[in-house]
Amino acid sequence: MMATRRTGLSEGDGDKLKACEVSKNKDGKEQSETVSLSEDETFSWPGPKTVTLKRTSQGFGFTLRHFIVYPPESAIQFSYKDEENGNRGGKQRNRLEPMDTIFVKQVKEGGPAFEAGLCTGDRIIKVNGESVIGKTYSQVIALIQNSDTTLELSVMPKDEDILQVLQFTKDVTALAYSQDAYLKGNEAYSGNARNIPEPPPICYPWLPSAPSAMAQPVEISPPDSSLSKQQTSTPVLTQPGRAYRMEIQVPPSPTDVAKSNTAVCVCNESVRTVIVPSEKVVDLLSNRNNHTGPSHRTEEVRYGVSEQTSLKTVSRTTSPPLSIPTTHLIHQPAGSRSLEPSGILLKSGNYSGHSDGISSSRSQAVEAPSVSVNHYSPNSHQHIDWKNYKTYKEYIDNRRLHIGCRTIQERLDSLRAASQSTTDYNQVVPNRTTLQGRRRSTSHDRVPQSVQIRQRSVSQERLEDSVLMKYCPRSASQGALTSPSVSFSNHRTRSWDYIEGQDETLENVNSGTPIPDSNGEKKQTYKWSGFTEQDDRRGICERPRQQEIHKSFRGSNFTVAPSVVNSDNRRMSGRGVGSVSQFKKIPPDLKTLQSNRNFQTTCGMSLPRGISQDRSPLVKVRSNSLKAPSTHVTKPSFSQKSFVSIKDQRPVNHLHQNSLLNQQTWVRTDSAPDQQVETGKSPSLSGASAKPAPQSSENAGTSDLELPVSQRNQDLSLQEAETEQSDTLDNKEAVILREKPPSGRQTPQPLRHQSYILAVNDQETGSDTTCWLPNDARREVHIKRMEERKASSTSPPGDSLASIPFIDEPTSPSIDHDIAHIPASAVISASTSQVPSIATVPPCLTTSAPLIRRQLSHDHESVGPPSLDAQPNSKTERSKSYDEGLDDYREDAKLSFKHVSSLKGIKIADSQKSSEDSGSRKDSSSEVFSDAAKEGWLHFRPLVTDKGKRVGGSIRPWKQMYVVLRGHSLYLYKDKREQTTPSEEEQPISVNACLIDISYSETKRKNVFRLTTSDCECLFQAEDRDDMLAWIKTIQESSNLNEEDTGVTNRDLISRRIKEYNNLMSKAEQLPKTPRQSLSIRQTLLGAKSEPKTQSPHSPKEESERKLLSKDDTSPPKDKGTWRKGIPSIMRKTFEKKPTATGTFGVRLDDCPPAHTNRYIPLIVDICCKLVEERGLEYTGIYRVPGNNAAISSMQEELNKGMADIDIQDDKWRDLNVISSLLKSFFRKLPEPLFTNDKYADFIEANRKEDPLDRLKTLKRLIHDLPEHHYETLKFLSAHLKTVAENSEKNKMEPRNLAIVFGPTLVRTSEDNMTHMVTHMPDQYKIVETLIQHHDWFFTEEGAEEPLTTVQEESTVDSQPVPNIDHLLTNIGRTGVSPGDVSDSATSDSTKSKGSWGSGKDQYSRELLVSSIFAAASRKRKKPKEKAQPSSSEDELDNVFFKKENVEQCHNDTKEESKKESETLGRKQKIIIAKENSTRKDPSTTKDEKISLGKESTPSEEPSPPHNSKHNKSPTLSCRFAILKESPRSLLAQKSSHLEETGSDSGTLLSTSSQASLARFSMKKSTSPETKHSEFLANVSTITSDYSTTSSATYLTSLDSSRLSPEVQSVAESKGDEADDERSELISEGRPVETDSESEFPVFPTALTSERLFRGKLQEVTKSSRRNSEGSELSCTEGSLTSSLDSRRQLFSSHKLIECDTLSRKKSARFKSDSGSLGDAKNEKEAPSLTKVFDVMKKGKSTGSLLTPTRGESEKQEPTWKTKIADRLKLRPRAPADDMFGVGNHKVNAETAKRKSIRRRHTLGGHRDATEISVLNFWKVHEQSGERESELSAVNRLKPKCSAQDLSISDWLARERLRTSTSDLSRGEIGDPQTENPSTREIATTDTPLSLHCNTGSSSSTLASTNRPLLSIPPQSPDQINGESFQNVSKNASSAANAQPHKLSETPGSKAEFHPCL
């Protein structure tokens, strides 16, 4: 409603009231007010009276109170309507601006003001003749302070002030916005409340009932609102001026539901009496009271203690009635609240002024409410005739009972509470100016809205609660009452009001409707009792709807949201709904629905997606429980929602803002649940509401309540002196009749309204707002509720929530104590009570704890959902007195609020808060808030993150906090005086169910006690042991939950822990168990999550925070802010825990539990490494095979809890994969990588040093420079990995494989930098590999000699890995984590590698371009020569290559892949490959064969080397990308260079079928074949380049079949079944690679001399590879490639690692073979255009101009070799990628491969093109029989043909597309190549998709097919050709292609198919 800004200014300064936005323009409000008043009774304003004050030394002797009046909801509605209609939009808008109203807060007796007759509550109209309208509070203060000795004030006497008479509801707002209120001094209300005309219905459709003005403004005419938002004048209230017992116009329900089961909640500010005939009502009241309490209480206390007292009396009087199951909310005379027929709230009678109606109910008999329920309405006001009371406070109290349980001052207090966030309100005003303007009244409106619909539909109980709350708490107070239900509802309404506001408010109403808000929100219930549910829904909802809207907007406290919810034009006022439920006394199922409703509302709150949505569901839920009405409610809620919701939301937000700054924030949060959390105040509500979406119904209510609670607590702090009164007032709200649903799921409807919550949260100033219900009354209600709760203890979570007032704020400690029996959840003193109120929510809370925060607080003891309350606290800034209890609550909330971020956290926080709040309520709120049981400076460190994760000391630093224990809340302040608003992390920690013990293991500090609550675990260091024990004792005393054994448990725990302390002084790790035990206890008691300690809502801080914390672990936290900052990090690092205190994972090495042998080594590392060494040295793929994620996570959690219990013999420690993954995970999660962040760049740079020795020395120096823990751990780990690598023969984990696994994990930066991951991956691999290989040297003082050797190997590795890694990275990217090899540590590796194209990428792209160019040239050449002699030695080649070295193996794999691909491509390719193989391998192969296939053969050979290059590239994703990019070209090239395709195929075949022979052949034929090979390489390179762009992998496969193929093949083999092959073994040995590489290269060199040169280089490389292989398979594999390319070496290193794994090798080999074949086919197609470009590029990169086949290639031979090496490396990466992709498939393929590489080739070929394979086969034959020189000649012939044929081939391919047949493949060398290319490509294209689809199936085939698809797809014609040929060949090869991608085993089928083709 109105934000109360209470400024405790000195007499003079008291004037500092910001009346900042008293928009005169909100005079449209005049209409609403006027209508309302006129309808009820014309206001006759005597006019302002002028008081002249003389300044004295003491000033003027008065202080001012600043209320921001937000535009009434109706005004907002009008404004919306007008805006929609184009009418007075501007005026409306202005009207909607929040208006500053300044009231006399205090008049010093004997002071000038006192003598002049200035009275408390007088509203300042003019200062020295200047109107305050439009002036900000500060401006008015300035005017006063700047006045001369004489100050002339024009004041509107409080009793005559419309705003005050109206109780700051709708009408108050309207009046505030009307000129009458300020200027015209219209006829003042006659002193009698009854005579007080209802304020003009600014926009209050519910104007008919005057009470709506303040308490019930929105709901007063909900029908009007829903019917016509402007129906303010609609006499919804039968007697607008009377008690507003008016039946809601729309459907005066024939049956007073409330009567039948009325929980009459008389919401008196002082006495929020709720006659709760049923538990429902009681629950409502208590919940409501809780919420209402803080905001109203503060206000009440501020403005009228006596009033509170009278109210208190009333409350007590009514309290008994509360227990009465009367359906009537007796409208008792001014001090008392009675149940009225309408039921819970007098609301039934008063739509216009719920509060008044309620208060009237209190004051009058049940029927009386109709007469004077609303102060807003003349009735209410007249019912409470200020003249009848001796003291203004009495009058206010009584009037509050009648009007809305709020006097102007009360409202001002609540406004001030909101006003405290005046800025926030203003802020929100922009967002929801209308809302703000109305927030005060809207708060109520809102409550009714939510309440109406919700109460009605889902849970009558909640409705009643909401209604009561709505009605009673006009702004804050009403909010308090309705707040519980409205609270969540309101916040939802607020922010989601547009969408879900109504539903939410309805929910609030549902929970709190029956409860008269202290503001008289009961009125909102007004005639609800008289209405049928449907009628209520319609009429009440309509009127309340508007009212609710108004209330929601004006008094966010009001749970008017339901009416809003009932967006159908019925504005089921939340009260009406609640009233109905109140009246109806919801049956148990209905009660349950109420809870559900609340829950839904909570969800709605938490779900920004739409209040309307939630509202609807809420309503629906209610309808489920409430029968039809709920359904109706839902409709109205949704329908009106649109109408009111939209209008409402802003006003509601403002309302809430007025009520609470927090609420205002909350409003935003409503719109965005996150926002809820964002705002310190609002977040508690919003966060609670927003975050626990699952419990939306209950949570929503809870949230709202929470905020009010926070506010209230704040207010309490502010009004500690007034605490009792506040509590009393709050008690009114607490009196919310919250009937527990039979299901026991009491919705937290009684939660305070958001406005109330906002007021409370804003509280610094708005403490008063919360004080509307006397604590006594509230306590009585609470007691009853508690009794009910106890009775239904089985459902304490729901019931306690419903029963426990969210913000009980017991004014009198005695009452609180009385209620103490009531479970803490029931008797949460101001804040605690709130939490218990929330107790009802816990079930929902678990879903969305934040929403339930408040309810959780109530419920907390049972369910422990304090997070909601905590949220409000943390998010809400309250006055200090409010803070006292609520700050705890708030602090808890802050902590909880953080928790709120996660349901788990919220849940825990809520529980904690709940306990705390329970305790607070139990002790008195005054005790809690005004009195700190203990306070002092303590060093504080959270042990558990918000997410429930344990945090290491390093994660969260110690901070010195001023700790104040109030009641059950422990508040942490940065400094003594900061208590008003602890930071969000300093939210009060609820100690209700806490376990406190001395902490020994958590920290090294002394005198540290650990406080374990349901939602947090923290350490406090006292100055000395005595202080620590005193704290422990005090906390223990405060920790008992009211009705739970938690306190005893806590004491026992403390005693036990103290004993343990003595026993565990030296034991650091046992305590974690104790904390866990305590957690268990806590969990058991509070229902906290399991493992709260480790999973406590604190999540690990960021690493920086962690570092700070770890550094400061022993020192007290120096900066609380820092600590807070760390919380998010902690949350992020949830899983990074220290084993002992904070877990093992995610904590710094120095924080990890040390190993027993070496304190610098983490225990986990020691254990895992030892276990692996004990059991896993012979375990194949150890560290590469990932463990079960669930098992790993489970073990991580256990280890994080503490490593003391580690039982290595446990079965869970039996899984070596899990253990190895655990180790990798540990290093991966290190906040500071093993190679520290600051050294990372140095390591990378050192690794890149060209001088091997220098590199090693630099690395060694850097290693020795590492921190001790890092150095020792690295040393230990390196030794371990070295040990593992030493067993690589069995475990297949060579240093390279281990490096691949651990490199990215160990060598990394804390921040995930994809660029680094990509560009540095080779370096990471190499560094780790180097460490493994030279561990002894690195970790010894001297080792220069060894570094040299190491350097050589390293250099080899380097040159190879870089390109390989780039490609590997690419492949990894493609493959993702599929390769088991890379899986664990490689998870990051693969992830990183995905993007690690950085440096390698550039290189690779160059290679691709060059390769493409080469490939193009090669294809051109090949096309004529492309036919290769089929060679049966393909398998041999594969075997040989695989056997050779790792490098060769990789090459073989590539070749094999190429061969497979060739086979897949078709027989032609196979023939070509065979020819190549023959040529390369078997010089003796008939030249005829070569000649026949010569054209293809030579080209194939040439393409083959390019293919190797390409293959090297192809492994990289870039290859695929290139393929995609160039696919059109490449397809063309492929078409044109079918021979090249064949060449790649032949290369593949060579590598596959005759790797050994090929190697030998290459060696033998190195001379002339080398020339050919040079040419062939050039072609292949061209093709490869082209392919690499299009399908570099394929080309590379073909070319690299011989060169890179071995490596790739090795990789493929290692991945595939090839792993079983001799090759893989040989590769492991390192032998095959050399031979393979050499033979490979020579095979290609047969094509050209340049190729020879290239082959020579390759051979050299091979030799190096051999050496390396001998030294290390990886090294060897790389060795052969090393000389050619360092970067490639690096890539190769990683490739080798993969390669080393037999499976990976096999797979990569197969995959590469496939890729090669496909790539060749594609390359040939692409070659024409791309090949040239790529050749050129590649020339620039590694090869000369391939376009000049002979000379250029010979020149290029080296570059080509390098390029090819790079390609090979790429192929290798590809192979690794293949391995990744098809480990399993490769295995299957491996079988096939083992059976015969040829089969694979055939299969691959079949996939690509049976024809191609046939051609390849011919090539093989020719190669075998023919000489390579003949191939060279053929190549030369083909070259010219190729250039010509590039075009002709394209055409030919087009033709071939049609022809595509096996015969095509075998056609003339030129023709066949072309044909082959088309058909092969067609097949390849087709196959490629298949292969791509089946990438996992066969690495090589996958690569090939993938490359090919890339190529084939872009060029449609080639694709078509491919498609046709594929169709033709596909028939033969498609099955193979399809299956083959899955398996190479399909090779037989494809082979068979190929044979037919042949």
Curated annotation (Swiss-Prot):
Residues 931-1040 form the PH domain. It holds the Pfam family RhoGAP. The keyword Cytoplasm applies. GO terms for molecular function: GTPase activator activity. Residues 1592-1861 are annotated as: Interaction with CTNNA1. Residues 1147-1339 form the Rho-GAP domain. Residues 1-42, 286-325, 418-458, 659-751, 859-885, 1086-1133, 1348-1401, 1418-1575, 1598-1642, 1655-1686, 1860-1958 are annotated as: Disordered. The modification Omega-N-methylarginine is found at R554, R575. Sumoylated with SUMO2 and SUMO3 in proliferating lymphocytes. The modification Phosphoserine is found at residues 36, 57, 459, 612, 616, 625, 717, 857, 862, 881, 924, 926, 954, 1099, 1115, 1418, 1432-1433, 1504, 1527, 1669, 1742, 1917. Disulfide bonds: none annotated. InterPro entries: PDZ, PDZ_6, PDZ_sf, PH-like_dom_sf, PH_domain, Rho_GTPase_activation_prot, RhoGAP_dom. It is found in: Golgi apparatus membrane; Cell junction; Cytoplasmic vesicle membrane; Cytoplasm, Cytoskeleton. Its main location: Golgi. The record marks R1184 as: Arginine finger. Interacts with GTP-bound ARF1 and ARF6. Interacts with CTNNA1. Depletion of ARHGAP21 induces cell spreading and accumulation of F-actin stress fibers. Functions as a GTPase-activating protein (GAP) for RHOA and CDC42. Downstream partner of ARF1 which may control Golgi apparatus structure and function. Also required for CTNNA1 recruitment to adherens junctions. This is Rho GTPase-activating protein 21. It comes from Homo sapiens (Human). The lineage of its organism: Eukaryota, Metazoa, Chordata, Craniata, Vertebrata. The gene is ARHGAP21.
